[in-house]
């Protein structure tokens, strides 16, 4: 996909004029996650590739093959899938059940009966047509990955449409010792985490797009193949919402498993804490419902354990009736940003739990969203910021519905073919000092990278104690090991052209992270938590939860995946086996 030559990346994944020349217009994207998919429409006339895909790609095909000469034998093993689907479904039972035990030999025997001897990495499962790289299906599916450096050419792509098909896929990949990667929406900056190259199979979950609401309208069942845009649109008819992505085109799966900061995260807590049921396909093919009372150990493990246990094929999320919001968006100059951060520190000490302030800084200016969960006029919650002069108003004070805000303003921008890299860190906020210091350190690094075409952004996401205590009180709590104190979950986000090496950017960003971390430790404000949704590929997310929680995740992973399929065959992730 290509973007207009006039478009340049700005904060929160948006696009617009060069931020050095027009901060007001460039701030068209104010609150979205700082990584939005390139499948959107912008003022430059780019088409919505995601929507086009809904009719360009027909439902039946499930397999795409990149290297046709090397992978041509795949067509001859496809008959194996019918044995599983006709001999019985993997049931919702324990991993040691007779059903689970019987499904694996069936798939293995079927492959053996074909008389084929294929090397690991040269095998894919499925029951429909296969396509070469020249087909119209393969490249659009690869381009679903949001960041350019994550658009790896997998040997094959599988798009299962049911838990039973996912069960078969994971069994055969395991039997054949084939590397794989799992993709929900592909909104990652880490190559290999939801993508894979010619050494393996991409399991794309986009057809797992269930959306249904319970009779009492308190629970939404959602498949990981959905993007938040579809979820919000579905819920509009019920005047409800859920804790979902600030950018509507982000996929459901990775957002929820990573924790998930919604627009009013300090009011409602993390998305992961609103999950009442995970439907999981474990590596032996068993389909398990994990709830607070059923497979409770797995349920608890998934409240922070990411994709160490299996493939999540369905989520039950608690719905929310609080959809009336007030918001305003302003731009501030670089010179005023230290004063703005001082006001932010004051605000975080005693924030109104119905309010939200989101800040994103780039080298030229800083954009701020002020939001309040109700229809109000000039809420006093933001008085701390009243003395800091803004340079312009992007969106004037407005009352709207939360879904309207997310669907309309949240899709106002577009990203192109930029590559990205992110890291995450956290620190306590007791006064403005470290917030201002971290911003100054960031500016120095950003200035050194800008001449080479690298745009570095700093997103200090302020967290108040209510987010932590809300999570501890919901559905048995989580494993994140959070401290109930005012804090910041900082993100350093880099966008850069493919002409700049990722290793160069990663080295510079990691050096910046090391400086910020070292200074935070010396000042006694460092926190070990690393927010998974913003973390870098080399960070140890699970270790940041604390030793006890890390060991618990390892125990659950061993129980549900004794052969270590998710640790050994999954292409890349925050593996518990690497962090012990």
From Swiss-Prot:
Segments carrying the region annotation (Disordered) are: 1-21
Record-level Gene Ontology MF annotations: FAD binding; oxidoreductase activity
For this protein, the record's PROSITE patterns field holds:
FAD_PCMH
Q: Which function does this protein serve?
A: FAD-dependent monooxygenase; part of the gene cluster that mediates the biosynthesis of yanuthone D, a fungal isoprenoid epoxycyclohexenone that acts as an antibiotic against fungi and bacteria. The first step of the pathway is the synthesis of 6-methylsalicylic acid (6-MSA) by the polyketide synthase yanA. 6-MSA is then converted to m-cresol by the decarboxylase yanB. The cytochrome P450 monooxygenase yanC then catalyzes the oxidation of m-cresol to toluquinol.
Question: Which GO BP terms apply?
Answer: terpenoid biosynthetic process
- The record's EC number reads 1.-.-.-
Q: In biotechnology, how is it employed?
A: Yanuthone D is an antibiotic against C.albicans, methicillin-resistant S.aureus (MRSA), and vancomycin-resistant Enterococcus.
The cross-references to Pfam families, in alphabetical order and at most eight, read: FAD_binding_4
Q: What class of enzyme is it?
A: oxidoreductase
Effect of knocking it out? Answer: Loses the ability to produce yanuthone D, but accumulates yanuthone E.
Q: Per its UniProt record, what InterPro entries does this chain match? A: FAD-bd_PCMH, FAD-bd_PCMH-like_sf, FAD-bd_PCMH_sub2, FAD-linked_Oxidoreductase, Oxid_FAD_bind_N
Q: What is this protein called?
A: FAD-dependent monooxygenase yanF
């Amino acid at each position: 996909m290509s973007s207009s030559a006039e478009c340049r990346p700005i904060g929160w994944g948006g696009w617009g004029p060069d931020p050095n020349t027009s901060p007001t217009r460039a701030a068209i994207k104010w609150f979205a996650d700082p990584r939005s998919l390139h499948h959107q429409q912008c003022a430059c006339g780019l088409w919505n590739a995601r929507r086009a895909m809904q009719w360009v790609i027909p439902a039946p095909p499930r397999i795409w093959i990149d290297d046709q000469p090397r992978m041509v034998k795949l067509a001859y093993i496809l008959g194996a899938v019918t044995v599983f689907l006709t001999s019985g479904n993997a049931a919702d039972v324990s991993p040691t059940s007779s059903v689970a035990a019987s499904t694996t030999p069936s798939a293995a025997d079927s492959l053996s009966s074909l008389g084929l001897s294929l090397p690991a990495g040269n095998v894919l499962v499925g029951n429909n047509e296969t396509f070469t790289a020249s087909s119209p299906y393969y490249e659009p599916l690869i381009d679903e990955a949001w960041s350019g450096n994550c658009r790896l050419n997998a040997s094959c792509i599988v798009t299962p449409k049911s838990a039973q098909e996912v069960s078969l896929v994971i069994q055969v990949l395991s039997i054949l010792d084939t590397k794989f990667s799992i993709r929900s929406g592909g909104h990652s900056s880490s190559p290999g985490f939801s993508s894979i190259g010619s050494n393996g199979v991409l399991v794309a979950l986009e057809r797992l797009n269930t959306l249904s609401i319970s009779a009492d309208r308190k629970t939404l069942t959602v498949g990981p193949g959905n993007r938040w845009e579809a979820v919000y649109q579905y819920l509009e008819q019920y005047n409800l919402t859920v804790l979902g992505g600030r950018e509507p085109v982000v996929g459901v799966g990775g957002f929820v498993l990573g924790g998930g900061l919604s627009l009013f995260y300090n009011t409602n807590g993390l998305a992961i804490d609103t999950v009442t049921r995970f439907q999981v396909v474990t590596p032996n093919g068993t389909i398990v419902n994990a709830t607070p009372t059923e497979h409770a150990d797995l349920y608890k493990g998934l409240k922070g354990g990411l994709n160490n246990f299996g493939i999540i094929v369905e989520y039950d999320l608690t719905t929310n009736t609080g959809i009336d919001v007030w918001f305003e968006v302003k731009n501030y100059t670089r010179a005023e940003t230290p004063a703005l951060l001082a006001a932010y520190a004051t605000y975080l000490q005693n924030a109104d739990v119905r309010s939200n302030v989101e800040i994103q800084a780039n080298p030229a200016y800083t954009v701020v969203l002020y939001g309040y969960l109700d229809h109000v006029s000039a809420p006093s919650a933001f008085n701390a910021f009243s003395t800091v002069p803004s340079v312009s108003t992007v969106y004037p004070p407005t009352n709207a519905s939360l879904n309207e805000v997310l669907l309309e303003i949240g899709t106002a921008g577009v990203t192109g073919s930029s590559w990205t890299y992110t890291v995450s860190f956290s620190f306590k906020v007791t006064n403005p000092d470290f917030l201002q210091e971290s911003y100054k350190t960031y500016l120095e690094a950003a200035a050194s990278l800008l001449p080479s075409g690298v745009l570095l952004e700093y997103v200090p996401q302020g967290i108040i104690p209510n987010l932590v205590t809300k999570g501890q009180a919901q559905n048995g709590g989580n494993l994140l090991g959070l401290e109930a104190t005012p804090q910041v979950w900082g993100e350093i986000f880099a966008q850069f052209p493919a002409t700049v090496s990722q290793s160069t950017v990663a080295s510079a960003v990691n050096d910046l992270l090391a400086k910020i971390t070292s200074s935070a430790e010396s000042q006694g404000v460092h926190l070990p938590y690393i927010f998974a949704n913003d973390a870098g590929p080399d960070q140890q997310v699970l270790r940041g939860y604390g030793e006890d929680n890390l060991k618990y995740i390892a125990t659950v992973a061993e129980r549900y995946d004794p052969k270590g399929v998710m640790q050994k065959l999954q292409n890349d992730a925050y593996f518990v086996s690497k962090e012990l």
